[in-house]
Amino acid sequence: MSSWKDNVRKVEPYVPGEQPKIKNVIKLNTNENPYPPSPKVEEIIKNADCSLLRKYPDPACSELVNELSKTYGVDPDMIFVGVGSDDVLATCFMTFFCSDKPVLFPDVTYSFYDVWAELFNIPYERVPLDGDFNINTADYRKENGGIIFPNPNAPTGIALELSDIEEIVKANKESVVIVDEAYVDFGTRSALELLDKNENLLVVQTFSKSRSLAGLRIGFAIGHKEMISYLWAVRNSFNSYTLNSLATAAGAAALRDKEYFEKTANDIINTRE
């Protein structure tokens, strides 16, 4: 099979965390939420009309997008959703990182970034953290084809201040800067506050951590309308039906239960402290 692309031959795939079949295990390998989903999610699932599963889901995920719009105070046209934030991020790599210049991300960070870069033939550069495992904003003032980093970073757990994020964004106006906020609800401010003045900023979040829905695979991106329209265009070019109907309804229900979300997130923060 010599026709296989070289980048596919050499790619080293991300290794997902094991899901043990035995009970009574304290499982820490994938940072799953120890608390169950919101009771409102359980109610939606228990009362789901299974006859609707014969139909394809809403490709626009309207119920979920509209609830995200209310929750975060943004226009629905500023929202893109996918099958977990990994799906959203992979679509971002395909859509925005198309330059012959390297994409920049920390050398100690989420290990999927270089996997996607290798798979999609995207040049990249791992930027070293400083001696205290912090991201040095000055290191991102160089020629690049895009920037991505988690905030807080994983696995260090160290977060950048919003002023530092804005410094990176403003210094790279010709590049898309993606802030991966998988753990943002456990200890730092969201870069969503910076969207109004920064059209090259994209913020990605997930329902897997703070909303206890890792098993349903729901992620989303929020950014300026033009960037979001490009994400939908790429997505609909190869798979128009991503989120299933149950995930869309359950995700919307989780967003409506703000009290439960805040309580469980604070419980986890207090446990860590």
Per-segment meaning from a language model:
Residues 95-116:
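Conserved PLP-anchoring active-site segment centered on the Schiff-base-forming lysine
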Residues 200-273:
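PLP-dependent aminotransferase class I/II
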Residues 1-55, 143:
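N-terminal "arm"/small-domain region of PLP-dependent enzymes with the aminotransferase-like
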Residues 125, 130-185:
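Active-site phosphate-binding strand-loop segment of PLP-dependent enzymes
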Residues 107, 126-130, 205:
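Short beta->alpha connector loops at strand-helix junctions that form conserved
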Residues 62-102:
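Phosphate-binding glycine-rich loop
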Residues 84-97, 161, 179-183, 187-188, ...:
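Glycine/small-residue-rich loop that forms an oxyanion/phosphate-binding "nest" at active or ligand-binding sites
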Residues 79, 175, 200-201:
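Short, conserved active-site loop motifs that form the nucleotide-linked donor/cofactor pocket
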